């Protein structure tokens, strides 16, 4: 089940004693639909004793003596949490490491929630008396290198209570060889040590590269085994790409030639020239023929030209009649006939032996020159000579020719029969069946196909007979292969057009109708969309250009709740002088969105209830001494319970002046939960900025833009993670020094800040890293571009990865990559949410964030990720949070990234339209289905956790153990993993979210805009796109295997991903085919119309999209520049990227002082010593720190809980490195 979030309101003693350990909802015992978690059937914990801490009432229980101010007027029934009727049975799934909820289930199995056997709510079991407050052992029951696959429901024995005041030894991670392995662990280790057979992929790569042995590769600069393996995998991938390109080329150009070979010569009726003579529907070239001497024909005469009667172009079928075949028995000898016969009754001829015109205009001529049977060629020699002639081609009729009313034509089995030739029968010579005359005189069969009319045995004989005696040609037909090729062509055409059209129209529908649902009702910017779009375009002309000032007073956030009144509501007054200005509009039938703040709406502010009275100094917005001590005594957030402090019992005996209990005097006060300046409940956001080698101007631009967003400072905090002690190329100071120079009002002086250890995302000895945590407030600087009236107080925390003492003298100490910077926050959020053991660094992050915000870190629901060279539009954060709050199914989103240095060079110019089309076409289309495959790391937002079902139930999203575990993968040993994790970590995070939560949404919010500078040198662009293209290919390979995405078969996101993958792989071949098609269309005939039309549509639809969605006509010019640069986009960049599949460096994209580009992921980094990293729960750290600060003996108290309000997740003692 999703992790419960249950506050502990005050209850009566009677209630405490009589409360049942089970809840009311019969569906809570069912596993959560999203995670499929099934609680253990046998409770692993001992039963609760009488007199211990009572169970809290369910948030939706009628016995709960509190009611949230913003509670849903139509609350969701608890049965909604249960699994709905479905054909899907999660319990039948195979739960292995490939399962999207594998790690979540392992964590959830250890939650303090006992399963219900009566169908009531799950029970939060407080095992206070069973926990060990201190431990004398420095060793844990696990190893950093151990793979844990055991039963997640295995019960954990409670520890023994230690004597009061016994000093607690630090808990540390230890190596595997420092403890004894259990039998189960030995078995697993033995399985891991087994040599596994090579995979099919490795075998294929070895076969493809058999011609390059290792010794040869070593001579070409590949001494490391990992390098050679990456090179072989690269060649394997390139071979597959070439095969796919060859297949596409075959379908485009070779398939028709293969299945529809060029037919023989076919001559259209009435177009057979004088060099041919027609016999039985075939044209014979008699241009060079010589006839033997015969009566009326000289020796070696050519019958086409040398005789008085010119036979060229005529039909001579009557001169070589097919007699006594199918017509035997139908056409018989007439009484008194002169036609010769033999003993079998075979006739010598049926018609007069003469020729007739091919157009059927010849009159019937029954006379014979010289003698009866002249020119009938009845001798064997004549017949054999005729049969030896080679037919030049077939004479064909079109259906228009057949339906010509001037002729009496019909079709039988593909042969064209001239029924008027039946008039040439001589009654005195032969007799024929009456059916012949009926067919000839029946006007309804003229121009028709008689194949299905003549179906009886007799009728079929009549049809075959007519074919033998009256055939004049064949119907114009195509072979099966030609028909198949046309079917493939038109199906492909329709298919591609359907995809292009659907993508275009759905993207347009998203821009016009769907996108507006995400936007906030009111912001600090103008409410006119056209005016705002123009301001954004002007703003993006220069990276340093400030945002426009507020020009529309009606849209300001001051005093606005984001709602518009209806005309009908003005008839009667809806408010009075006693109505709170922050009152929630309960007239709406839709339930209000759920946030952490709205769920804590029964909380009140510090004594006095008003942030500007009693506890606060109204002039300087600072806490007075009494308020600061009150906050320090509670160690909770500024939102305190209206009836009791959440965990005041934990801190009752602590000195409020201790180092942990201090909250900064400049902390931004929290407004009431009912305050909705933008029309939706506010949610707390962490703005994560990852910095590497950026300069002062770039970082200042980014932090200024975040600090001056119109989103309230009480609900946002800036977190900057500096990836090592790095000095950018051409910079006078290191990046950490630059960032620290932008902070003020430090909680701890920078020179007094210590470095703390944590487990980094790396390999070998680099897994141990150290970092410093600086907490304070953002300082705009003395020469700030920001107007002093706009400078606001924004809490800020900086994490500087400084490295271990061993790497202090090395290059780039502390540098572990951007993914490690993100994991620092993600892992921290996971451990806060699950109350797991955390490192010292994470404990300091907890304290630092709480001291400068007054909020517990678990109150933060979203993370805005911004690169340190990006500038955010003032209302972008407001729109992004609006989308998240309005739709809890959205787990990730991104805004539009615009280019600030458009005219820096031709390299930057060709990127303008590419950025535009990637957002407004690709991402808009994917947003319709909630499946944006790539959320750019420079400007995106992820949901930390999402409300689920009833009140106070939350599901971890970004903080989900499966996300954190997979994203923090440190065993990167294959080409696929290296491209995913070393080059495209931002895109891989989006892929990982979709794989883990395929039913949730990732969308594009066009109202959120940022600007950035793009590469203006071609070598930098080449390096950047190499990383992006290779990352795209490998992420699409991962995503195409996810079967649970929206839709089915061809109408699914999975199929769209497959098409994108194939399209990306064949880009170089496709552009080559395009140019070939254009060239052959110019130089050869006939012109291939269909491919050209398809090409025009594909290239022309974006122009229509510009007209309908863009706000400047200049984008037409940018599109023209983009089309001219298509060879670069579709050939040069992809081909270079494919050839560099085994290059995992960032190349020219981010250069530091004195850095030399090298291939990443191939160096040996030593051995990881886990004993240097201490991990404890927050309560243990807190107790130890306060005990040391007070200098007194710590009296054992019930286990400390973090100020999140969540119970400790018992069962996470050891740190596991999966």
Curated annotation (Swiss-Prot):
GO terms for molecular function: chitin synthase activity. Residues 14-34, 175-190 have a biased composition (Basic and acidic residues). It is a multi-pass membrane protein. Its EC number is 2.4.1.16. It holds the Pfam family CHS4. Residues 1-93, 132-190, 548-570, 582-606, 1188-1218 are annotated as: Disordered. Optimum temperature is from 30 to 45 degrees Celsius. Polymerizes chitin, a structural polymer of the cell wall and septum, by transferring the sugar moiety of UDP-GlcNAc to the non-reducing end of the growing chitin polymer. CHS4 synthesizes a large amount of chitin and appears to play a role in the process of cell separation. CHS4 is particularly well suited for functioning at the higher temperatures associated with its poorly characterized saprophic environment and with human infection. This is Chitin synthase 4. It comes from Exophiala dermatitidis (strain ATCC 34100 / CBS 525.76 / NIH/UT8656) (Black yeast).
């Amino acid at each position: 089940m999703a992790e419960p979030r249950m506050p502990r309101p005050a209850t009566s003693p009677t209630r405490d004693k009589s409360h049942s350990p089970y809840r009311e909802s019969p569906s809570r015992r069912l596993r959560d639909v999203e995670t499929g978690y099934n609680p253990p059937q046998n409770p692993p914990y001992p039963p609760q004793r009488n007199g211990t801490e009572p169970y809290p009432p369910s948030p939706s229980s009628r016995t709960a003596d509190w009611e949230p101010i913003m509670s849903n007027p139509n609350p969701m029934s608890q049965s909604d949490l249960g699994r709905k009727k479905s054909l899907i049975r999660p319990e039948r799934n195979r739960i292995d490491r490939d399962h999207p909820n594998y790690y979540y289930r392992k964590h959830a199995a250890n939650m303090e929630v006992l399963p219900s056997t009566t169908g009531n709510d799950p029970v939060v079991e407080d095992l206070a008396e069973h926990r060990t407050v201190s431990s004398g052992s420095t060793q844990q029951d696990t190893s950093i290198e151990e793979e844990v696959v055991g039963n997640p429901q295995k019960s954990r024995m409670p520890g023994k209570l230690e004597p009061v005041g016994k000093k607690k030894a630090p808990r540390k991670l230890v190596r595997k060889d420092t403890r004894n392995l259990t039998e189960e662990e030995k078995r697993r280790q033995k399985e891991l040590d087994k040599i596994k057979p090579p995979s099919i992929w490795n075998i294929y790569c070895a076969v493809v590269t058999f011609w390059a042995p290792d010794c040869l590769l070593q001579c070409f600069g590949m001494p490391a085994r990992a390098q050679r393996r990456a090179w072989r995998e690269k060649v394997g991938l390139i071979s597959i790409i070439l095969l796919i390109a060859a297949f596409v080329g075959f379908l485009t150009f070779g398939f028709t030639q293969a299945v529809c070979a060029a037919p023989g010569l076919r001559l259209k009726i009435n177009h057979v020239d004088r060099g041919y003579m027609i016999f039985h529907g075939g044209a014979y070239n008699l241009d060079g023929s010589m006839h033997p001497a015969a009566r009326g024909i000289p020796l070696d005469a050519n019958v086409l030209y040398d005789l008085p009667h010119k036979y060229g172009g005529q039909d001579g079928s009557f001169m070589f009649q097919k007699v006594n075949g199918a017509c035997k028995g139908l056409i018989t000898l007439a009484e008194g006939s002169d036609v010769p016969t033999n003993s079998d009754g075979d006739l010598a001829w049926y018609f007069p032996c003469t020729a007739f015109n091919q157009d059927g205009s010849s009159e019937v001529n029954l006379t014979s020159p010289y003698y009866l049977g002249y020119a009938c060629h009845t001798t064997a020699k004549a017949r054999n000579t005729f049969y030896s002639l080679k037919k030049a081609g077939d004479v064909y009729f079109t259906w228009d020719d057949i339906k010509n009313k001037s002729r009496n034509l019909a079709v039988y089995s593909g042969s064209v029969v001239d029924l008027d030739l039946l008039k040439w029968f001589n009654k005195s010579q032969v007799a024929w069946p009456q059916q012949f005359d009926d067919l000839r005189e029946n006007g309804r069969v003229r121009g028709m196909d008689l194949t299905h009319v003549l179906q009886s045995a007799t009728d079929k004989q009549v049809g075959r007979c007519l074919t033998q005696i009256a055939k004049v040609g064949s119907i114009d037909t195509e072979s099966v292969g030609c028909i198949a090729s046309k079917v493939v062509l038109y199906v492909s055409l329709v298919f591609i057009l359907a995809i292009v059209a659907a993508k275009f129209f759905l993207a347009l529908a998203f821009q016009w109708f769907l996108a507006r649902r995400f936007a906030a009702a009111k912001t600090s910017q103008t409410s006119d969309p056209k005016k705002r779009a123009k301001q954004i375009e002007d703003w993006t002309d220069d990276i340093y250009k400030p945002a426009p000032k507020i020009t529309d007073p009606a849209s300001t956030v001051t005093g606005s709740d984001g709602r518009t009144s209806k005309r009908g509501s003005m008839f009667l007054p809806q408010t009075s002088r006693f109505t709170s200005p922050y009152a929630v509009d309960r007239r709406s039938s839709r339930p209000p969105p759920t946030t952490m703040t709205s769920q804590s709406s029964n909380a009140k502010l510090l004594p006095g209830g008003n942030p500007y009275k009693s506890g606060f100094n109204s002039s300087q917005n600072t806490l007075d001494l009494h308020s600061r001590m009150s906050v320090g005594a509670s160690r909770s957030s500024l939102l305190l319970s209206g009836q009791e402090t959440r965990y005041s019992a934990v801190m009752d005996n602590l000195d409020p002046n201790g180092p942990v209990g201090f909250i900064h005097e400049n902390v931004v006060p929290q407004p009431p939960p009912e305050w909705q300046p933008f029309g939706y409940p506010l949610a707390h956001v962490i703005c994560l900025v990852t910095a590497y080698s950026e300069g002062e101007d770039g970082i200042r631009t980014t932090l200024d833009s975040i600090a001056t967003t119109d989103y309230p400072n009480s609900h946002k905090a800036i977190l900057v993670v500096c990836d090592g002690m790095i000095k950018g190329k051409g910079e006078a100071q290191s990046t950490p020094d630059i960032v620290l120079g932008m902070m003020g009002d430090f909680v701890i002086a920078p020179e007094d800040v210590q470095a703390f250890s944590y487990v980094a995302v790396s390999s070998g000895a680099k897994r141990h890293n150290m970092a410093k945590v600086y907490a304070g407030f953002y300082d705009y600087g003395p020469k700030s571009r920001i107007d002093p009236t706009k400078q606001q107080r924004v809490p800020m925390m900086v994490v500087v990865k400084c490295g271990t003492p061993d790497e202090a003298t090395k290059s780039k100490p502390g540098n572990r990559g951007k993914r490690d910077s993100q994991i620092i926050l993600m892992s921290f959020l996971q451990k806060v949410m699950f109350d797991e053991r955390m490192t010292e660094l994470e404990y300091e992050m907890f304290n630092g964030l709480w001291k400068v915000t007054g909020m517990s870190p678990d109150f933060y629901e979203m993370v805005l990720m911004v690169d340190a060279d990006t500038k955010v539009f003032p209302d972008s954060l407001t729109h992004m949070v609006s989308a998240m709050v309005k739709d809890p199914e959205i787990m990730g989103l991104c805004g539009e990234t615009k280019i600030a240095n458009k005219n820096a060079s031709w390299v930057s110019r060709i990127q303008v339209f590419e950025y535009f089309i990637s957002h407004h076409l690709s991402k808009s289309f994917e947003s319709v289905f909630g499946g944006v495959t790539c959320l750019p790391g420079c400007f995106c937002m992820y949901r930390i956790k999402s409300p689920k079902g009833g009140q106070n139930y939350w599901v971890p999203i970004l903080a989900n153990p499966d996300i954190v575990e997979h994203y923090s993968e440190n065993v990167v040993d294959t080409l696929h993993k290296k491209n995913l994790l070393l080059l495209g970590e931002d895109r891989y995070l989006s892929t990982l979210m979709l794989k883990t939560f395929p039913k949730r949404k990732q969308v594009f919010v066009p109202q959120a805009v940022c600007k950035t500078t793009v590469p203006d040198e071609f070598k930098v662009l080449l390096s950047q796109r190499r990383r992006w293209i290779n990352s795209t290919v490998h992420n699409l390979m991962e995503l195409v295997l996810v079967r649970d995405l929206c839709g089915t078969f061809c109408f699914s996101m999975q199929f769209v991903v497959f098409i994108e993958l194939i399209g990306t792989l064949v880009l170089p071949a496709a552009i080559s085919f395009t140019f070939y098609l254009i060239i052959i269309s110019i130089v050869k005939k006939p012109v291939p119309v269909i491919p050209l039309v398809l090409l025009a549509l594909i290239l022309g639809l974006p122009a229509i999209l510009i007209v309908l969605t863009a706000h400047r006509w200049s984008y037409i010019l940018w599109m023209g520049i983009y089309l001219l640069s298509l060879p670069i986009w579709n050939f040069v960049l992809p081909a270079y990227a494919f050839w560099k599949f085994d290059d995992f460096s960032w190349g020219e994209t981010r250069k530091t002082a004195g850095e030399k580009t090298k291939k990443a992921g191939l160096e040996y980094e030593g051995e990881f010593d886990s004993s240097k990293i201490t991990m404890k729960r927050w309560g243990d750290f807190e107790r130890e720190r306060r005990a040391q600060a007070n200098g007194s003996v710590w009296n054992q108290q019930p286990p400390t809980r973090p100020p999140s309000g969540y119970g400790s997740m018992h069962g996470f003692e050891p740190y596991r490195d999966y």
